[in-house]
Amino acid sequence: MNNYYNTKTEIAYLFGVSEGTVRNWIKRTINKELNLDLADIDGDLKIIKNTHNDSLINKLIKNGRKYRQLDLKEERKVSSKLEKLLSYNQTLTLINSIEVNKEVPLKFAYLGEGADIWNKFYLSTKKGDVYSSNNSDVFLLDKQYPIIIEHFAPNQKINVVDLGSGNGYPVTEILKKLKSENKLNSYVAIDISQKILDITKKNIEKVNLGVPIHTFIADFESQSLQDILYSIKHNEQDQNIPNLILMLGSTLPNIEPQIQPLLNIKAGMTVEDYLITSNAYDKPETRTSFPAFEFEDGKELILQIPKLLGLNNENCKTEKIYNQKKGLKEFNLVLQKDLQITFPKLNKTIKLYINDRINVWKYRRDTFELINKKCKDAELVQHFTVRNPHMNQIMYMVGIV
């Protein structure tokens, strides 16, 4: 691997500037106005990849924006719909994420009518195998059912806890099987979206399980589940009922870094509890495919919050890439002009600049090595890891001992 940036285009992409700006940096270095480290490669000056250069470039960008006049700026106020949709803390999280990470968190897309869009998206993908994670979850849970049950006492009842419940469909079959064997104590759905929980509860009630159904609003990406999971385990008779926690539908791969939600879940687990999660398996030939975007509902869901922010095809172009450096797929909005976005209720304005990349979706596929590392970092023990032989999906179950 070269220790220098191959092209000006590469630098422009990584740092969100124009190629002309990169040429100007090199020219100023030649004139001894800057002290970038350069390498002469066959007569072509290249910017070397090192911490000194990266630090200086970031400083140049920051200073340039500080004093820059936004002559071509576009001013937008966020939709009143967005201000009603998000809580005060969620709005602060959104602002911080855009300013610091240049990212619109996908989790907010499931709030409000986003829940209905998600439900439509799921139902449309269920008809085929283009977007196969949900179908694979049902298959793998059924295949691994005997192994899952072996981890619980023969006559032990179980709480099924559905994290990021979606519409509840992927867990329906395992709920039926547990009920038929008199092993199901209760079903619990946890999600950031009340509307998602309403859809889930309605669908699970149709199954007629005859057990309590509970719902909790929680953002397990940033919030410890200790209190919620403890309250589920100890019912009114103060029985210690183990939790089987399911986080399906490739929920975890949309979150970065993944260690924090794992720790938030682990905080509420005891030795009797287990977590099962799933993902697509990473192969080089799949890194340029974006199956979710083959469905209009999928694109609508992902772009819902950006549109309420004023990010649209008039001021942005879209970009689907595999980020080799980060090892994940990205869907970005690339600013075509300077933009100021105002949040009237908070009297807060954020500034975005031409060529800024705003990430609105990311996805990290798994490998056995990545799973091993996640479990090691979170101090979780793997009890099984299995791949779907028909679909490119993987599922694993972990515990705290």
Descriptions of predicted regions:
Residues 1-25:
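Polyanion-binding surface elements
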Residues 282-370:
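SAM-dependent methyltransferase
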Residues 269-284:
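Conserved beta-strand signature within the Rossmann-like core of class I S-adenosyl-L-methionine
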Residues 253-265:
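A short, conserved alpha-helix within the catalytic core of class I
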Residues 65-161, 168-216, 224, 234-235, ...:
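Rossmann-like AdoMet
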Residues 348-401:
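C-terminal lobe and adjacent flexible extensions of AdoMet/dcAdoMet transferase-like proteins
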Residues 245-247:
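A conserved beta-strand element that flanks and buttresses the S-adenosyl-L-methionine
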